[in-house]
Amino acid sequence: MQKYDKYIESAYSRFEKWKADDDCVVFPIITDLHSALVSEDVLNSQKRETLSHIRILNAAAERFSADFTANLGDFGVDVPVKEPQDIEQLCSRLFEYHASSKVKPVLYAPGNHDITRGVVPAFMRRGFQEINAGCDILSPEDKLYGYYDIHAKKCRVFYLFCNETADYYSAEQFTFIEENLFSMPSGWCAVFVQHKCILRRGRWQHDQFDPLPENFVKLHELFANFVRNGGKIAGIFSGDSHFNLFEKADGVNYHSSQGYGGIGPSEAPAHALLAHEFCPALNRTDSFNSENSCLIDVAAVKTGKCEIAVFRIGAGDKEFDITENY
């Protein structure tokens, strides 16, 4: 992993300059690993060993003195398709890498490709409960959503399960979000991490003009109403899109990280921002080369000044840094 140190140090120097003497909430994000490698086998002739990049995430968390780490889903269950025993091996490696992090908790927001063949209930819940044992996380029993309070920095971090039902968010989860957002202590801010971007601009080209799911619209309206009434949401962080996006909608900051998935030219909307090159593992030019680089975003929130920043580690470097108010 030493070859990635230069990327971490480059981002850290930019973060340090922005941070100055201010206290802030810090968390590195990784998403859409879509790993094709199980043990030492190559599946479907695609050598795509991205799970090990969680170790880069862990190194970044330690270097930045992070408050937690976030994985926004789609780690590689069914793209390419795997047999049940391979999925179990893949999950074991996922947990092993995350468990080795010196920074806890690890907030995992399951993606649409994580729910194949019941993988989420079978492995995810138990695995991350063990990893985060002892952390002050509030989550309904047997659910894959909840929140983590960082009391010293007055920040509540929600992690959501946006593929819980056919309607994306169950009524129970929606009620949980609403009640615990509006009941935050005075002066606190909220951060949300989840797999899917709920904005239209986060969708692929063929979905751009389809109606948005009702619960996406409903959730955005909840966020916007909270902000209109004086509440503070630092940002909504997601993956899934496979391209970079930053959008302020009705006073709410949305950030989508490109991650490792890749997107073909015909599927990328005109506004999509991409760090890309020819990728030998995929034999196409729609992703960066994960054998030579990495793609991790480090988010930082100055809760005392209502400022947010995102610093790119790896592909694209400072080109994809963002600073904004909330």
Where are these regions (language model features)?
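N-terminal active-site segment of His-dependent metallophosphoesterases
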Residues: 1-85
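Extended active-site neighborhood of metal-dependent phosphoesterases/phosphodiesterases
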Residues: 3-19, 80-184, 218, 222-224, ...
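Active-site-proximal beta-strand elements of phosphoester/diester hydrolases
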Residues: 24-40, 154-164, 193-195, 252-259, ...
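Active-site glycine-centered loops adjacent to acidic/histidine catalytic or metal-binding residues
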Residues: 32, 73-74, 111-112, 195, ...
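Short, solvent-exposed loop/turn elements at domain surfaces
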Residues: 35-41, 166-169, 263-266, 318-321
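Surface-exposed cleft-lining segments at the edges of enzyme active sites
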Residues: 36-44, 75-82, 158-168, 203-210
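Active-site-proximal segments of metal-dependent phosphoesterases and phosphodiesterases across multiple
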Residues: 42, 87, 170, 174, ...
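Acidic, His/Gly-rich catalytic cores of divalent-metal-dependent hydrolytic chemistry
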Residues: 303-326
